[in-house]
UniProtKB/Swiss-Prot annotation:
SUPFAM superfamilies: POZ domain, Voltage-gated potassium channels. The chain crosses the membrane at residues 214-234, 247-267, 280-300, 313-334, 349-369, 410-430. Belongs to the potassium channel family. V (TC 1.A.1.2) subfamily. Kv8.1/KCNV1 sub-subfamily. GO terms for molecular function: potassium channel regulator activity; voltage-gated potassium channel activity. It is a multi-pass membrane protein. One of its GO terms (cellular component) is voltage-gated potassium channel complex. This is Potassium voltage-gated channel subfamily V member 1. GO terms for biological process: action potential; potassium ion transmembrane transport; protein homooligomerization. Keywords: Cell membrane, Ion channel, Ion transport, Membrane, Potassium, Potassium channel, Potassium transport, Transmembrane, Transmembrane helix, Transport, Voltage-gated channel. Potassium channel subunit that does not form functional channels by itself. Modulates KCNB1 and KCNB2 channel activity by shifting the threshold for inactivation to more negative values and by slowing the rate of inactivation. Can down-regulate the channel activity of KCNB1, KCNB2, KCNC4 and KCND1, possibly by trapping them in intracellular membranes. It is found in: Cell membrane. It comes from the Eukaryota. Residues 1-213, 268-279, 335-348, 431-503 are cytoplasmic.
Length: 503
């Protein structure tokens, strides 16, 4: 198909990719009737990213709510009034205009615009493979096209890619992390800035230096010892000295308290520090111990009934010590990925709970009425059947409650089978999301490590002129490490059946 250049202009560069244009109907451009093109009064030229297209106002009038449809109306109004300054002006819809040649300029992607032209021809929008979903969405939104206009053959793949791109928006997360990192590391204000900065690096960057790595290992050991000690304190073993366990508990709490206080003293914005989830977890890990001491010290003059109530409060507070396990999230990428996955998959988790609730309600009721007439049945009530249905649908099957009749066994078989099918659907989505979050965090950690190494190397070169290091090789190694992690991510996604997510 031949594109008609405007008068006084050279024809478009033949190097442009015209293969995709050959499939476009000529009605989008200047209509060709009996070998004679329409007069230029019925058309105008748009220049998108350096590529020029002559469009028909009649074809664009079918889409009045799009940007080009509005531009066609404005251009027609300008011609009738004979002035570019008509209200509204074409400059409100384009980046620049040439009224002499009737040409309007758009600083947008010419490659994406070819799909927009195809939409004007057929009324259907297809997703281009070369751009990411969010970039393509920005383009069609600029041209005033709703993403719901995407054809059914591309709609499912597009929305899956869009969801994954929004979830793993690496650039935005990196910028937020860097801005937060810079705000917390502003040690120029306050006392002892050098000491605070070094102490902060040891506390928050386990891989920054040898002291930081040693501190990270010791912190993990204290968390593990504290958890084991908490378990041993609940067991009445004759060979264990309770006083020794209490001393060990005091030592662990002292370490956790000192670690939290040092972090609190190092930061500049302490209110923001207390609002962060890892710091809230650290605070909840040590507060029950001190609250327990306070309650026990104030209960000396209480009556017997009040002492029993205080004892219940103390037991509840001691249960909160299990939150110390979450402190390992500072040192474990997997735990952080799990937290991100639960946060991002709340809809899938809610859907999973809904499916389980419906199945448990139905099968427990049917099983109860099928087994209630049997002597010495274990299905004594519907709540007991709830427990049986829960263990059956989750394929745990403790065996403490089991059916005896043939009808009950058939219902149990249907319950187990439905549980397998119900759990398989959301868990597959959650598993894919967890894998994506895990490898994204790995990429971020690798990027942070390489950035810190480059900064340190550059600083050493600036201070010592005898050091000879090829920064290009260092940068190449960092890129290769991130590509290796990205390759593992793609392989994991491909093995889980998520090939369509990557492009």
């Amino acid at each position: 198909m031949e594109l008609l250049p405007p008068r006084g202009r050279a024809p478009p560069d033949s190097s442009l990719d015209s293969a995709s244009l050959t499939s476009l109907d000529s009605s989008v451009f200047c209509s060709e009737g009996e070998g004679e093109p329409l007069a230029l009064g019925d058309s105008f030229t748009v220049n998108v990213g350096g590529s020029r297209f002559v469009l028909s106002q009649q074809a664009l009038s079918c889409f009045p709510h799009t940007r080009l449809g509005k531009l066609a109306v404005v251009v027609a109004s300008c011609r009738r009034r004979g002035a570019l300054a008509a209200v509204p002006s074409p400059l409100e819809l384009c980046d620049d205009a040439n009224p002499v040649d009737n040409e309007y300029f758009f600083d947008r992607s010419s490659q994406a615009f070819r799909y927009v032209l195809h939409y004007y021809r057929t009324g259907r929008l297809h997703v281009m493979e070369q751009l990411c979903a969010l970039s393509f969405l920005q383009e069609i939104q600029y041209w005033g096209i709703d993403e719901l206009s995407i054809d059914s053959c591309c709609r499912d793949r597009y929305f899956r890619r869009k969801e994954l791109s929004e979830t793993l928006d690496f650039k935005k997360d990196t910028e937020d992390q860097e801005s937060q990192h810079e705000s917390e590391q502003d040690f120029s204000q306050g006392r002892c800035p050098t000491i605070r900065q070094k102490l902060w690096n040891i506390l928050e960057k386990p891989g920054s230096c040898t002291a930081a790595r040693i501190f990270g290992v010791i912190s993990i050991i204290f968390v593990a010892v504290s958890i084991v000690n908490m378990a041993l304190m609940s067991a009445e073993l004759s060979w264990l000295d309770p006083q020794l366990l209490e001393i060990l508990e005091y030592v662990c709490i002292s370490w956790f308290t000192g670690e939290f206080v040092l972090r609190f003293l190092c930061v500049r914005d302490r209110c923001r520090f207390l609002r962060k989830v890892p710091n809230i977890i650290d605070l909840l890990a040590i507060l029950p111990f001190y609250i327990t001491l306070l309650v026990e010290s104030l209960s000396g003059s209480q009556t017997t009934q009040e002492l029993e109530n205080v004892g219940r409060i103390v037991q509840v507070l001691r249960l909160l010590r299990a939150l110390r396990m979450l402190k390992l999230g500072r040192h474990s990428t997997g735990l952080r990925s799990l937290g991100m996955t639960i946060t991002q998959c709340y809809e899938e988790v809610g859907l999973l709970l809904l499916f389980l609730s419906v199945g448990i309600s139905i099968f427990s009721t049917v099983e109860y009425f099928a087994e209630q007439s049997i002597p010495d049945t274990t299905f004594t009530s519907v709540p007991c059947a709830w427990w049986w249905a829960t263990t059956s649908m989750t394929t745990v099957g403790y065996g403490d409650i089991r059916p005896d009749t043939t009808t009950g066994k058939i219902v149990a078989f249907m319950c187990i089978l439905s549980g397998i099918l119900v759990l398989a659907l959301p868990i597959a989505i959650i598993n894919d999301r967890f894998s994506a979050c895990y490898f994204t965090l790995k990429l971020k950690e690798a990027a942070v490590r390489q950035r810190e190494a480059l900064k340190k190397l550059t600083k050493n070169i600036a201070t010592d002129s005898y050091i000879s290091v090829n920064l290009r090789d260092v940068y190449a190694r960092s890129i290769m490490e991130m590509l290796r992690l990205k390759g593992r991510e793609r392989a994991s996604t491909r093995s889980s059946g998520g090939d369509d997510f990557w492009f």
